[in-house]
Amino acid sequence: MRIGHGFDAHRFGSTGKLILGGVEIPHEQGLIAHSDGDVVIHALCDALLGGAALGDIGRHFPDTSAEFKNADSQKLLHRVMVLLKEHGFKVSNGDMTIIAQIPKLAPYLPAMRETLALALGLPLQRFNIKATTTERMGYIGRAEGIAAHAVVLLLEEQ
């Protein structure tokens, strides 16, 4: 068994869509990023890669590459899952926390959970996602951006 942890944060300011956990969230601003800015999936990818000792998302999908400009993070997650399988790993379970002052995310968490559990090949009871605020403290509390943490347990396939 191996544990992986991932973190990502992005600043608001894009005129694009706000995508979190593969779900479009109605909001006046998107997140500034080379890809689609999905901090939830980026944190999850880092947790998966870290648990397998395969580096991080920046190494596999560099922001200097035109190939990943405006990339759909769900496709990046799929590529990470293929890489894990090639290295003999499968996901046992996962837990995530999104930290955002705005927008309120509770109505969108079930869709994110379903989307990500499916992408990981997990039943819903093995994947959790929740959201919190920083009680108006720091850059997140000032509504400057959104962050996410992910923890996964990986199993080595026999």
Curated annotation (Swiss-Prot):
Which cofactor does the UniProt annotation name? a divalent metal cation
Any one GO MF annotation of this record: metal ion binding
User: Which transformation does this protein catalyse, written as a reaction?
Assistant: 4-CDP-2-C-methyl-D-erythritol 2-phosphate = 2-C-methyl-D-erythritol 2,4-cyclic diphosphate + CMP
GO process terms (BP): isopentenyl diphosphate biosynthetic process, methylerythritol 4-phosphate pathway; terpenoid biosynthetic process
Residues carrying the site annotation Transition state stabilizer: 34, 133
**NCBIfam families on file:** ispF
Report the family membership. Belongs to the IspF family.
Protein name per Swiss-Prot or TrEMBL:
2-C-methyl-D-erythritol 2,4-cyclodiphosphate synthase
